[in-house]
Each structure stands twice: as structure tokens, then as C-alpha cells.
């Protein structure tokens, strides 16, 4: 009797469940077998290139031809899964391919973010710098209303009374009420290589000096000659709203510096501050010209 030769399991041909082929070349890209093993890729490099080409096709051709040898019911389910996956990849994969470089990184302009940050930082510095042209025919005095150092407070009062006696219009910037005035004074004194010692007077945008300089110029008559082009005030009076300080409590937070979005029921907005006032909870007075 003839004995039938049995082939080992590894030599038996496996049944192919379905195949995926390229729509351009017709080459088989992937095969899935019925035994549940991982699909074998015939050519991974060619498969990736063909897959990208299929995603970027503008005429809406199908990306793969699915063939099945048996089990028609399972074939229909597999076809639906493959078509759904292909459609989703086509919807989102085209954008990904367009913005990705060969190395897989997102394309962009080199140092674009850092250059933009430097540009905006320089722009804010330029806008914050007081211009001498804007202070033409104007007197600006930097003072303080704090009496911690009595000598400084008395010198500020002396300079203020000197300009009030000349009946000229001047702008007083109290650094105790607004911290931005202090930063502005430091920047302007740094440009003229002078120490910011209160009070400081600027006429026509140029640094004039402190209390001693103003007092000596007033006694010699030089100050009166500089004030000939400055606008005169015939009847000086204090603003009834702010009392001549130029600032009022914030109308939004009433001086508490708390944001309107904060409440007593949650601590999620604890760090929010009012954006309508400064660090002291004050706003510029709108009824006076201080």
C-alpha cells in the first residue's frame, strides 16, 4: 500500500483572507491570512509611497482593491472596514502629508517665533518711551506725595509752589500713585545719565534738574525766560473730583483690584485682577487736566 505523505504545517499554503493592492500599479501591498497571524508587508517602502500618492489623489479614486477568496459575508465586513479607514485617512492624512517634512517634523520658518517675540518686545518699548515732540511747550514734574522721607516731600512741595506762582500749566506725575511713572522716570534719567532723585523737572521734553536747580534758576530769572512759551493759567483751581491728585478710585472694582469674574464660591479665579485700574486700584481723573 502506498502511504500518503503528510506535509508539515509550516509548508502548507495559508489561505488568504483578502489582499490590498495599489490603485496605480496594481501591485499587491498587503495580505491578510485566515489563521490570524500578522499581515506580511511585501514592500513597506513602496507601500508607504503608494499610500501617500493615493491620499493626495484629487479625483477621488479608490485607494485599494480588496479581493477575497471565500466567505462572502466576512468579505463584505472587511471591505467596509477598509473603506472606512481609507476615507478617514484621506480626510485627515492629506493635511498631515502637506505640512510634514521628510524627517517627520512640521514645516515652518526658522526662528520665526523668537523673531516675532523680539519684534513685539521692541515695539512696546518704543511705544512706551516718552517722546520730546509730544512734550513740546509743556512742563512735566515728577513728584511724590509720600511723607516717609520728609526732606523729599518738602522739596516736591517747593517745586510745585514755584511753578504755581509763575501761573503756568504743568503736568505733575506722582510716582506714589502710579508705578508706571517711576519706570518712566528711571528710563528718562538713564538716557541723560542722571540719578532719578525726586523731584525732577522736564521742560520741552528736556531734563532740567531737581529742586536745587529749579530754586537757583528761579532766583536768577532763568526759569522765567524758559516759561515764556508755556501756556498760562489765569485762575488756578483744584479739580473738585480728585482734589488735584489726578487719580480716583476705580469705578469697576472700587479700589479692591479684584476682577469682576471673581466670586466667593470658587478659588479658580483667585489670581484675576481688575484690568481697568493700576496696581493701587486707581484710575486717571477724567474731569481735570492734571
Swiss-Prot record:
Its main location: other. GO terms for biological process: auditory receptor cell stereocilium organization; calcium ion transmembrane transport; cell morphogenesis; cochlea development; establishment of localization in cell; exocytosis; inner ear auditory receptor cell differentiation; inner ear development. This is Glutaredoxin domain-containing cysteine-rich protein 1. Residues 127-234 form the Glutaredoxin domain. InterPro entries: Glutaredoxin, GRXCR1, Thioredoxin-like_sf. It is found in: Cell projection, Stereocilium; Cell projection, Microvillus; Cell projection, Kinocilium. CDD domains: GRX_GRX_like. PANTHER family: GLUTAREDOXIN DOMAIN-CONTAINING CYSTEINE-RICH PROTEIN 1. It is linked to Defects in Grxcr1 are the cause of the pirouette (pi) phenotype which is characterized by vestibular defects and profound deafness with affected mice displaying abnormally thin and slightly shortened sterocilia. May play a role in actin filament architecture in developing stereocilia of sensory cells. The lineage of its organism: Eukaryota, Metazoa, Chordata, Craniata, Vertebrata. It comes from Mus musculus (Mouse). In the inner ear, expressed predominantly in sensory hair cells and their stereocilia bundles with higher levels in outer hair cells (OHC) at P1 and in inner hair cells (IHC) at P5. At P1, expression is prominent in each row of stereocilia within bundles including immature shorter stereocilia. Expression is also observed in apical microvilli of sensory cells at P1 and in kinocilia at P1 and P5. In the adult, expression is localized throughout the length of the stereocilia of both OHC and IHC (at protein level). Pfam families: Glutaredoxin, GRXCR1-2_C. The gene is Grxcr1. The keyword Ribonucleoprotein does not apply.
Amino acid at each position: 500500500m502506498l502511504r500518503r505523505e503528510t506535509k508539515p504545517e509550516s509548508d502548507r499554503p495559508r489561505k488568504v483572507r483578502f489582499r490590498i493592492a495599489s490603485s496605480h500599479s496594481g501591485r499587491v501591498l498587503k495580505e491578510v491570512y485566515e489563521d490570524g497571524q500578522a499581515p506580511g508587508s511585501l514592500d513597506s517602502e513602496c507601500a508607504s509611497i503608494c499610500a501617500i500618492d493615493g491620499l493626495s489623489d484629487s479625483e477621488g479614486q479608490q485607494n485599494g482593491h480588496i479581493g477575497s477568496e471565500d466567505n462572502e459575508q466576512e468579505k463584505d465586513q472587511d471591505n467596509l472596514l477598509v473603506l472606512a479607514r481609507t476615507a478617514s485617512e484621506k480626510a485627515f492624512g492629506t493635511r498631515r502629508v502637506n505640512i510634514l517634512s521628510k524627517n517627520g517634523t512640521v514645516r515652518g520658518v526658522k526662528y520665526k517665533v523668537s523673531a516675532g517675540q523680539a519684534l513685539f518686545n521692541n515695539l512696546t518699548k518704543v511705544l512706551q518711551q516718552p517722546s520730546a515732540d509730544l512734550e513740546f511747550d509743556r512742563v512735566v514734574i515728577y513728584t511724590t506725595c509720600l511723607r516717609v522721607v520728609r526732606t523729599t516731600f518738602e522739596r516736591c512741595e517747593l517745586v510745585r509752589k514755584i511753578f504755581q506762582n509763575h501761573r503756568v500749566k504743568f503736568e505733575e506725575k506722582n510716582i506714589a500713585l502710579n508705578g508706571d511713572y517711576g519706570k518712566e522716570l528711571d528710563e528718562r534719567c538713564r538716557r541723560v545719565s542722571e540719578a532719578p532723585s525726586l523731584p525732577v523737572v522736564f521742560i520741552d521734553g528736556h531734563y532740567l534738574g531737581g529742586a536745587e536747580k529749579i530754586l537757583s534758576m528761579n532766583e536768577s530769572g532763568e526759569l522765567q525766560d524758559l516759561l515764556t512759551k508755556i501756556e498760562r493759567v489765569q485762575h488756578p483751581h483744584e479739580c473738585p473730583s480728585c482734589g488735584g491728585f489726578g487719580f480716583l478710585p476705580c469705578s469697576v472694582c472700587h479700589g479692591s483690584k479684584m476682577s469682576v469674574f471673581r466670586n466667593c464660591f470658587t478659588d479658580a479665579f483667585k489670581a484675576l485682577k481688575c484690568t481697568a485700574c493700576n496696581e493701587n486700584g486707581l484710575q486717571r481723573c477724567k474731569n481735570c487736566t492734571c
